[in-house]
Amino acid sequence: MPQLSLSWLGLGPVAASPWLLLLLVGGSWLLARVLAWTYTFYDNCRRLQCFPQPPKQNWFWGHQGLVTPTEEGMKTLTQLVTTYPQGFKLWLGPTFPLLILCHPDIIRPITSASAAVAPKDMIFYGFLKPWLGDGLLLSGGDKWSRHRRMLTPAFHFNILKPYMKIFNKSVNIMHDKWQRLASEGSARLDMFEHISLMTLDSLQKCVFSFESNCQEKPSEYIAAILELSAFVEKRNQQILLHTDFLYYLTPDGQRFRRACHLVHDFTDAVIQERRCTLPTQGIDDFLKNKAKSKTLDFIDVLLLSKDEDGKELSDEDIRAEADTFMFEGHDTTASGLSWVLYHLAKHPEYQEQCRQEVQELLKDREPIEIEWDDLAQLPFLTMCIKESLRLHPPVPVISRCCTQDFVLPDGRVIPKGIVCLINIIGIHYNPTVWPDPEVYDPFRFDQENIKERSPLAFIPFSAGPRNCIGQAFAMAEMKVVLALTLLHFRILPTHTEPRRKPELILRAEGGLWLRVEPLGANSQ
């Protein structure tokens, strides 16, 4: 048997057993990995010294707890952006640096990079994976590029135009409920609650052509979506439950899994029903029947989509994209609409100007509906929406992981492997970009003022190749909802100021409560 000399350890020759050799090889590999990680870590520390950082909270925990998902945390962030307008560095523990980017010039190299070069960092998005799968939100690389190309036609204005009737119908249902509640003396409403149900109602019709009546009666599917969103945000705050094994042992984890199954089963059933319809009718007859109803829903578009090689999306891919659209489409739009109504309640002069603009547009029209061509005829309402999206962007932050070194315009380098947070709120509150950033001023978005700013100064829908594919859908829905709401109601503030709560979506602690006052027929 071969002899192995371990005299350097003070031992004599010993038999070189396979297990000892395996132990030595494994130990050498582990040592090499530790040394490589240590070298990379210290090299990155050296290269990141050019990025300023606030004082650490603790030598071990670093800056954890400095910017909390609360109103106080938002104020701290605003102060940090004022102090470090070009961006800054935070440490999450002793070994995890995070770059916070909050200036248009600094984010340009990251936002313009491809999905393969600057993918989303899954630390912040991974909890959505069991629900949303490999949809546009979570996929990367070639799969993301292929899906993006195939989904783009789904958001062409010819597809979006017929959705206008759906938006009008859904908001009218919400308004009927508001009228009833106001007549019963319940004029103080949580905007998030009511608008979330309304956007989900619209989305089920636009995505699945399904009438759930969820604004008027409970819906198991809608309840599951709302529950999934809440569980993801709750888990994000519980570090000990970030491990899947531990999370799925908890009651929340088991409820999350059940809700996932319910949502997936609903989507799968719709897909299978359409798959059965297509072969019997043929594509031409299928499209003719759809033309009669004047609406091609999202599932239809996905089923008919083909890539450059003629390949279709799999059922699993279609489910992932439909579930992603339901998630992204309801929460973000509900957040955006709720905060616009809040600002218009706080600024009655702007609210009245918007109302007059809508009244002028719709005078002598019967029935009172917002049509596609009307959207371009509401310039001041659009300015008010954009200024609210600046102050309260529905998605406060997006993360990117650098798979290569990024050279910034000022010469600094972001090393490969570093996670960057493109802080949308930070950019929108940056005093070097926006004078008096905390003031609500719709005239910032007057055409003359827009010319003087970087296009990356205002990015509520992100920017670059991975920007929000559904932003035209979202803006159209927001304009319809706001125009009809201001036509029928006066929106008034309550005595308590909402406290911002930045999670995956920017919410308000305990809801965003406003008072609604029905307007008489003469006022309309």
UniProtKB/Swiss-Prot annotation:
Tissues where this protein is expressed: Expressed mainly in human liver, followed by kidney, heart, and skeletal muscle.
Where is the protein localized? Answer: Endoplasmic reticulum membrane; Microsome membrane
* Cofactor(s) of this protein: heme
Report TM segments.
15-37
Alphabetical GO CC annotations of the entry are: endoplasmic reticulum membrane
* Sequence positions bearing 4-hydroxynonenal-conjugated histidine: H261, H347
Which UniProt keywords are given for this protein, alphabetically ordered?
Answer: Endoplasmic reticulum, Fatty acid metabolism, Heme, Iron, Lipid metabolism, Membrane, Metal-binding, Microsome, Monooxygenase, NADP, Oxidoreductase, Transmembrane, Transmembrane helix
List the EC numbers from the record. Answer: 1.14.14.1, 1.14.14.79, 1.14.14.80, 1.14.14.78
Q: How is it modified after translation?
A: 4-hydroxynonenal conjugation impairs substrate binding and the long-chain fatty acid omega-monooxygenase activity.
Q: Does the keyword Metal-binding apply?
A: yes
- Where, per the database record, does this protein carry 4-hydroxynonenal-conjugated lysine? K451
Top EC group: oxidoreductase
Q: Which residues carry this modification: 4-hydroxynonenal-conjugated cysteine?
A: C45, C260, C354
GO biological process per UniProt: arachidonate metabolic process; blood coagulation; cytochrome metabolic process; fatty acid metabolic process; menaquinone catabolic process; omega-hydroxylase P450 pathway; oxylipin biosynthetic process; phylloquinone catabolic process
Question: Any idea what this protein is called?
Answer: Cytochrome P450 4F11
> Which organism is the protein's source?
Homo sapiens
